[in-house]
Amino acid sequence: MSFLDTLFGKRERSSDIARDRLLTVLVHDRVKLTPDMMEQLKADLSAVIARYVPSVDAGAIEVTLLRGESVDHLKADIPLRRTTQKY
């Protein structure tokens, strides 16, 4: 079966996708962050970071909650635009 998996690629099962979605909902519930609060947090982070780092692509910032073994994590992916250095 592994030969077929490598040949055609193994797709993620719907049960795994459903489990991940449920974990996301549970983490959001435990931390008490609503989707509106997450969007406000993303907007606030974008504004503050753009003030100090002009090469931030504010529209591409992603904020997610991750469930850890003993601690939940707030993860922010902040892509930076590449700029040329002038010396």
UniProtKB/Swiss-Prot annotation:
Record flagged with keyword Cell division: yes
Function: Prevents the cell division inhibition by proteins MinC and MinD at internal division sites while permitting inhibition at polar sites. This ensures cell division at the proper site by restricting the formation of a division septum at the midpoint of the long axis of the cell.
Biological processes, Gene Ontology terms: cell division; regulation of division septum assembly
Family per similarity comment: Belongs to the MinE family.
InterPro entries xrefs: MinE, MinE_sf
Statement: the UniProt record of this protein carries the keyword Acyltransferase: no
Gene3D superfamilies, A to Z: Cell division topological specificity factor MinE
Signal peptide region: none
Organism for this UniProt entry: Roseiflexus sp. (strain RS-1)
Listed NCBIfam families: minE (TIGR01215)
One Pfam family matching this protein: MinE
Keywords (A to Z) from UniProt: Cell cycle, Cell division
Protein name: Cell division topological specificity factor
